[in-house]
Regions:
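Substrate/cofactor-recognition hotspot
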Residues: 1-125
Length: 125
């Protein structure tokens, strides 16, 4: 879903109108323009998804910088715990998540997922 949100943000940034965003999505993902039926259906789909996402609360994601591990001591059999620092997440910049974007962008992300999951994309890719 991260890649679909990234594509949706690009579509929103590069095109203002929904029809243009759908056209650009087809060009980027499938290498062709949508026909009029596809464009009309996908405009309705994105608008329906925008309404759906307005009603849904997307969870926010956080990344830990430390975790607690529990182990068993090899010779005595006693359990012990220690805190492990995860330096990889200290300066980590994650992709935008659903809870960080607008319902419209999530609707565009659904369009991107739809295209990414099409047989035509698998063939082009």
């Amino acid at each position: 879903i991260d890649r679909s949100i990234a594509l949706a943000l690009r579509l929103k940034h590069e095109e203002v109108a929904l029809a243009g965003q759908i056209e650009l999505a087809f060009q980027l993902v499938l290498g062709r323009s949508p026909d009029s039926t596809e464009k009309n259906r996908l405009q309705r789909y994105v608008n329906d998804m925008k309404v759906y996402h307005r009603e849904q609360v997307a969870p926010k994601r956080s990344y830990p910088t430390k975790i607690t591990r529990s182990l068993v001591e090899e010779f005595s059999g006693k359990t012990f715990s220690y805190e492990e620092i995860l330096p990889v997440y200290e300066d980590y910049t994650p992709d935008r998540k659903p809870g960080e974007v607008s319902p419209f962008v999530r609707g565009l992300a659904d369009l991107a997922l739809l295209l990414f999951n099409s047989n035509e994309f698998l063939y082009v890719y």
